[in-house]
Amino acid sequence: MLKTRSIGLNVAGVPLLNNISISCPKGSVTALMGPNGAGKTSLLRVISGEYKASQGTVDINGRGANDWARPEIAKFMAVLPQSSTLDFAFTAEEVVALSRTPHNTGLSRDLEIISSALSMVDASYLSDRSFVKLSGGEKQRVHLARVLAQIWEHCENQSSDGGILLLDEPSASFDLAHQIMLIEIVQKISTAGVTVIMVMHDLNLAAKCADQLVFMNSGECTAMGTVPELLTSEMIRKVYSVNAEVGLHPVDGTPLIII
C-alpha cells in the first residue's frame, strides 16, 4: 500500500505539485496520465524520494517514507526513469547486476536472478553485449530487467509486504511486441503483490494494464478512478482538449480510444 497525502512541491520557487493525495493498494497498477508538464514525473520523483516534498507525506505500508532506511527501501522499491545515462562499457548482464548491490543473497543466486530478469524482458541474447552499443529500445529493456532484479524477491513470490515499482514512460522506446511484453510483465508482478505506478501517455495501453488512472494537469490531480470510470470521451476532451470516441475492444472489452 502506498499513499500520498496532500503532496506539494516547489522547486526554485516554482510550484510543481499542489495537494496531491492518491492511494495505491498492494498489487494494484496505477497509471499517472495527463498532458506534458502536468506534474506526473515530479510526483513519481517525490514518491521515490528523489525530490523532497515541500508539504505533505508519502506513506509506504503504513510507515512514512522517511522512516525507511536506504538499504531497506532499496530492496523494496525500484525506479525506472525516463532516461538513464550510462557511459561505461558494461555488459548488459553487468548493468542488471548493479541492482543486486543492496542484497546479500550470494553470487550464485544473484546470477540466477539476473538471468531470469533478462529473460523476462526478452534480452537474454544481450547478456554479453556492451550496453553502450545497444539500441534505445534494447537499453530500455536492460534497464527494465535491472529494476525487476532489484525487487525480484517481491516479483517472484506473493510476499506479505509486496514491493513497489515506479516506471516513467516505460514503453516510450518499445516496439509493438515489447509494449505487449511490458503489459504482461506488469500484470504478472502485480498479481504477485507488487504495486506498480507508471507515467503513461498511451491511453489504450493504460486501458490494458491499469487498475486505476490518475489524471493530472498543472500540478494537480484532476481525477482518480477506474479505467471504465475515467476513459470516456468527456474526460479525454477535458484533460487533453481532444475529441475522441471511446468504444469497447472486441476481444477483451476494455475501453478503446479512437481519434
Predicted regions and their residues:
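ABC ATPase nucleotide-binding domains
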Residues: 233, 238-259
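Conserved structural motif at the start of ABC-family nucleotide-binding domains
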Residues: 2, 17-19
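Conserved ABC transporter NBD signature motif
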Residues: 56-64
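ABC ATPase NBD coupling module
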Residues: 64-78, 88
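The feature captures the beta-strand-to-loop junction immediately N-terminal to the Walker
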Residues: 33-35
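Helix-to-loop junction immediately C-terminal to a conserved catalytic motif
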Residues: 48
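Conserved ABC ATPase "signature" region
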Residues: 109-126
